[in-house]
Structures are given as C-alpha cells and as structure tokens.
Amino acid sequence: MNCVQVKDKKQIKRFKNFRRTLYKNDPFYVSTVEFTVDMLLDKTTKFAKSCITRPIMVEENQQVLAQCVLVKNPYDDFVQMAFFEGLERQEQAVALLKEQAKVFAKEMGVRRIIVGLNGHLSYGVGLSLDMEKPNTFDSTYTKTYYPQYFTDGKEHKLMAFRNTIEVFRSKLVQRPSKFTVRTVDFENFSKDMELFKQVCDETIGTTFLYAPTQDKHFEELIGEMKFFLRKENILFAFDGNEAVGFLFWHPDYNEILKKGKQNSLLSIALRYTLFKKKIKTVKVNSIGVKEKYQGRVTIQLLNEMMKYINSYDYAETNFVWENNRKSMAINRHIGGHIERNFAVYEYEI
C-alpha cells in the first residue's frame, strides 16, 4: 500500500474514474460536483489557477483505495483535504492521506487541515452524515461512512432545512419598506457579478471557512449557470444607492437529472429544457444582508423571491452552520425541519 501524487494525464483520468465508479448506480447520487473537481484539477478558472493543488491517491495491487485533492487557497490559513473519496474499511489508506496532508500543511506554512471543504464554500462543503435521498443541486453528497474516518478530528456540523412553499410563505410577515429590490441585469452581468462578490464578502465574509473571493469568482461560477437562470434568481436589496443584501435562489435542477450516472453539461441542458416544469423544489442557495439591516431586508428579499415560486411545492435551504445562532433561528422558523446533515473535520498539527 502506498500513497502517490497524481501528476500526468493518465493518473488524472484514473483519479476521476475512481470517483465515477464509486457512485455508479447509486440511487441517491446526482453527478454535478464533478464539474468542480474538473475545474480544480484542470485549472480552468482564475480561482483554480490561484490555488496550489496536489491530488493524491492510495493504491494497493493496482487498485485505488482512497484519494483526495490537497488544496491551499491563498486566502486560507489552512489546507484542505478536498473531494475525499474512499472504499469502506480503509482506515490505513486514509491514515496515509492524513500524513500527506500534514506534510503539505507544513510546506504551506499553516497548522490546520480541513476535511470536507471543496476549494471554497461557494463550491460545496460537508461530508454527508445521512443521505438516504438524492442530493440537491449545489449541495455535496458523499458516502455516509466517510465521517467514521475522521472522528479523531474536531467536528463542525451543518445542515439544510426544508419546508412546503405554503408554510414557508405563511412565516413571512410583509411590512412597508423604504428599501428597494431589483433583479440581476444580464446585460451588465460582469458588473453585477462584481456587485454580488462585494455584497457577499461584506455580508457572509465572517462565516466559518469563508475565504474572500477574487475578481471574476462569481462571474465564472454563476456564468456557467446562465442558461438555467432567469433574472429573478439573483436579487439585490438597496438602501438608496447602497447595496445592503442579496439572495440567490434557483430550481433544484437535480430533481430531473439521472441518478448514479454521469451527467454532461449538454445532457443537463437537454433535460432541463424538456422537463423543467417537473421540478417541484427551489433552493435558497445563499442569502446575505449587512448586519444593521438583518431581519427587515432578509424578510423583504424572501418575500420578493416568493413572487416567482408559485409553481413549486417545496423550498430547501443551503447549508447552515450549527453554531450560527442567527441563521439557525431564522431557518428553524421559516425553513421547517432539518432535511440533511453534514460535517466538516478540523485537525491542528
């Protein structure tokens, strides 16, 4: 058994194939995260090019047992064991990955290792603690035995909430407001994505594990989704000329995608074109409001979203950290019950 660094094209292909084989025919897995894996490994975005990445795998008798991508984001004070995957009962193989992560951390001059973060919070976070249901678009999905490999680390829990649109709407109080809300301007998409970056960094920049974003970060990330988006999917709130909040929501595209199979951008676009009316869930991908406006503007943004989702039956949030009391309170009130549980693991070296 040995741990090897993935360097050439043949090894990278093997790395990607291990993941695909692992989830093949899994009835709860929708293969959308592969696009993020490809982005980091192939260095196709400004963000990916800014990161130091080192994919590694443990193999024995020409069989891959476990793998991950070691990542150092220049804005983080830790390294990541991102996109961890492995077979069951492979404690020794995972231990070898951890040792290499420690070596990598020392090379990068940091003393923390995070397991369960995939490059940046905007690309996905969390190992699944329970997942007997298909993953939603922009949420992670992993084998539920993975957390057992990291119980020696500090656990940070996060969860997603779900409720019916009817109940969700009933929890929102509508009040007169001096604030204005507008949709994204696709004619000035680059400019609005920089506004999105600015407001996002200013509002959720203190969230655990969040790293400041670089220029073009959201233009590259959300730009790939433009075919699937309508202008009302991204909302900005203003106090006069000052942007004070944002909300990004979208249909759960995964509901109409094939499970346990490889999905290409073309196949996703085709199925969306043919079956988009069958989607019954919307995802509240992210919402951020400057502190002094929280409450009033938060509710106004959610009420604005409600104008566009009458044809859906359910709403589900993205992740919420368990120790974020404000976010947990509003999600419990509006979001209903906890639908999914995830965890991230932290190591000090």
Enumerate the language-model features and the residues they cover.
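Conserved catalytic-core motifs of GNAT/GCN5-like acyltransferases
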Residues: 116, 134-148, 154-164, 337-348
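Conserved donor-binding loop and adjoining core beta-sheet/short helix segment
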Residues: 32-136, 238-256, 260, 275-282, ...
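Short amphipathic alpha-helix that is part of the acyltransferase structural core
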Residues: 1-44, 77, 175-217, 242-245
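Conserved acetyl-CoA-binding loop-helix of GNAT-fold acetyltransferases
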Residues: 90-103, 281, 285-289, 294-307, ...
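C-terminal amphipathic "assembly/sorting" segment characterized by alternating charged
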Residues: 299-349
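Beta-propeller domains
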Residues: 191, 202-208, 220-237, 247
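Conserved beta-strand-loop-alpha-helix junction that forms the acyl-donor binding cleft
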Residues: 114-144, 289-291, 317-327
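Conserved active-site tyrosine of GNAT-family acetyltransferases
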Residues: 15, 150, 330-331
